Curated annotation (Swiss-Prot):
GO terms, molecular function: triose-phosphate isomerase activity
Chain sites annotated for binding substrate: N9, W10, K11, G171, S204, G225, G226
Protein's UniProt keywords contain Ligase: no
Active site: H96, E165
Pathway in which the depicted protein is active: Carbohydrate biosynthesis; gluconeogenesis; Carbohydrate degradation; glycolysis; D-glyceraldehyde 3-phosphate from glycerone phosphate: step 1/1
Upper taxonomic lineage: Bacteria, Bacillati, Cyanobacteriota, Cyanophyceae, Oscillatoriophycideae
Quaternary structure and partners: Homodimer.
Subcellular location: Cytoplasm
Catalytic activity: D-glyceraldehyde 3-phosphate = dihydroxyacetone phosphate
Gene Ontology process terms (BP): gluconeogenesis; glyceraldehyde-3-phosphate biosynthetic process; glycerol catabolic process; glycolytic process
Similarity comment: Belongs to the triosephosphate isomerase family.
Gene3D superfamilies, A to Z: Aldolase class I
Source organism of the structure: Trichodesmium erythraeum (strain IMS101)
Protein name: Triosephosphate isomerase
Length: 241
């Protein structure tokens, strides 16, 4: 069954004190949020244990921003699914464009991370999307279909979320038109073995466009960057109309 999931990706922002202040401002604004909407906060690693204790028993689920494919080992700077599960994480972002661009993430390593997340009962949020050059060259579909074909080898689509993030719209203020995002997400859904996979849109989602985005038939939620750092703007996204 397709779920509605609004997930905030904090990237490399917020100390524990800032996270605490954020939650104090957010929680009171979620009292009327429909129960069927799932809210996820993907925080920096340093905040996971702290946030897990505060969020216990609330409607907000905890997410991480990366996971290694091994359970342990000499992998400096990495974190395992076993470790994430141990601190109460439920979701983990895999294959975000910034990981692919800045840290050499490939479809092969994305695939291994997806399977590692599922091995430990974590729900991965797989990010796929095209660059501005690929879109202008008419390669949007072929690029995304290639990502899906390689990333999802032997991945259980029953425990999976996909986020369509047009790279040219991330942090730029340029938003993919809602109908175009809906079209691409429909194409993504058509390539999956399971039509009930939750598919989010990510890319400059803001209070002034979230209602239009979430009104689209194929869009099940949002993966939010900058607007998730402010409790007022994030609560507006969660409580979209």
């Amino acid at each position: 069954m397709r779920k509605t999931i609004i997930a905030g990706n904090w990237k490399m922002y917020k100390t524990q004190l800032e996270a605490k202040e954020f939650l104090e401002g957010l929680m009171s604004q979620l009292t009327k949020t429909p129960e069927e909407r799932e809210v996820v906060l993907c925080t920096p690693f340093t905040a996971l244990d702290f946030m897990s204790k505060i969020l216990h028993g609330s409607l907000i689920r905890l997410g991480a921003q990366n996971v290694h494919w091994e359970d342990e080992g000499a992998y400096t700077g990495e974190i395992s699914g076993l470790m994430l599960k141990d601190v109460g994480v439920s979701y983990v972002i895999v294959g975000h464009s910034e990981r692919r661009q800045y840290f050499g993430e490939t479809d092969e390593t994305v695939n291994m991370r997806l399977k590692a997340a599922q091995k430990h009962g974590l729900t991965p949020i797989l990010c796929v999307g095209e660059t501005k050059q690929q879109r202008d060259s008419g390669e949007t579909e072929s690029h995304i279909f290639s990502q899906l074909a390689n990333d999802l080898v032997d991945v259980d689509q029953e425990n999976l979320v996909i986020a369509y993030e047009p790279i040219w719209a991330i942090g730029t203020g340029d938003t993919c038109e809602a109908k175009e995002a809906n079209r691409v997400i429909g194409l993504i859904r058509g390539k999956l073995n399971n039509s009930n996979v939750t598919i989010q849109y990510g890319g400059s989602v803001k209070p002034n466009n979230v209602d239009d985005i979430m009104a689209q038939e194929e869009i099940d939620g949002a993966l939010v960057g900058g607007a998730s750092l402010n409790p007022e703007s994030f609560s507006r996204l969660v409580n979209y109309q």
